[in-house]
C-alpha cells in the first residue's frame, strides 16, 4: 500500500524528472539553434518575443502565461486604459486579451469580443465610451478564432446591438471542439455563451475583402492554431497616411505535429502576402505577446507612430515566428 507521503514523493520525483527532461530537450542543438536564431533576428527591438512564451515549449504555454501575464485566466481581471494604436484603430480590453475597434467613418468594426457578458459590460463598453465610440455604430464582430477569449462576448454583442458575427466556416464548426473551454471552466469563469453554429451570420472566405468607409480588411484562413483561424491585413489611417497592418490570427504554438505543420505553412503564406502588401505593423488581441503595449508606451518620436515598424520589422517578426516553430518541431522529434 502506498502511503500519502510516498505518493507525494513519487509525484515530486515525477515532476523533477519532467522538468529535467524539458531542460535537456531545450539544450539539444536542434532546439537551441533555432531559439538562438530567433533571438538573433529579434535583436534588442523584438527580443521579448523571442525570449517569451512564443519560443518556449508549446506544452508549457498556458502554465507560463498564468504565472507571468497579468490577468490571464482570472475571471474578474480589470480592464486597462483603452488606447489608440492608429488614428482609427483602438485597443480596448484587459492586459491578457482584448479587442480592436476599427472606426471606418461609416461604422465600427470590432475584432474579437472578450470572454463573456461581464467583460463586455464592464470593460468593452466603458472603454469605447471613453474613446467617444458608440456601440450602436457597430456593424460587424470579427472573431479571429474559436477560443473563448476571442469569441466569448460575441453572442451577447450580437443580441444587444444586432451585429453579425464573422468567422471562417471551419471555426464555426470548431466551436464544438474548443480546446480552450475547459481551462476557462476550471478557472471559474461564469458560463460562456457560444455563438449559435446553426445561425452562421457571415462565413468569411479565404481572400475575402470587407470594405467599409475609409477602411479595408482582407481575410485569410490560416489553419494551425485552430482549424479556421482568421488572419488579416487591415488598412488604417495614420497621420494622413494609409498603412497596412498585419494581424496574425492565432499566436500560441500547438504541440501536435499536424497542427504545427499547418501553422507553419500558413505563416509562410501570410508572410509572403504581407511582403506584397508592404505590411508595416504587427498587432494582436494578445497585444503583450507582440509587444504592442511596449511600443505604445514609448509614444511618438519625431511624429512617428511607435506601432509602425516598417516592412523590415514585419519581416523580422515573421522570421522569429518561423524559427520558434522550427524549435517546436525539434522538441517534438526529441520527445518521440
Name each region found by the language model.
Residues 27-30, 36, 118-120, 128-209, ...:
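Active-site HxH/HxHxD metal-binding segment of metal-dependent hydrolases
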Residues 12, 16, 23-72, 239-242, ...:
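Accessory terminal helices/loops
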Residues 111-113, 138-146, 166-168, 221-224, ...:
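Active-site neighborhood of phospho(di)ester-bond hydrolases with catalytic His/Asp-centered motifs
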Residues 118, 146-152, 172-175, 227-230, ...:
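Active-site environment of divalent metal-dependent phosphoester hydrolases
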Residues 75-131, 231-252:
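Conserved beta-strand hairpin/beta-sheet module of binuclear metal-dependent hydrolase folds
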Residues 107, 136-139, 161-164, 215-218, ...:
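Loop/turn elements at helix/coil->beta-strand transitions in domains of secreted/extracellular proteins
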Residues 1-8:
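Bacterial N-terminal signal peptides that target proteins for export
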Residues 78-79, 84-87, 122, 133-137, ...:
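Metallo-beta-lactamase
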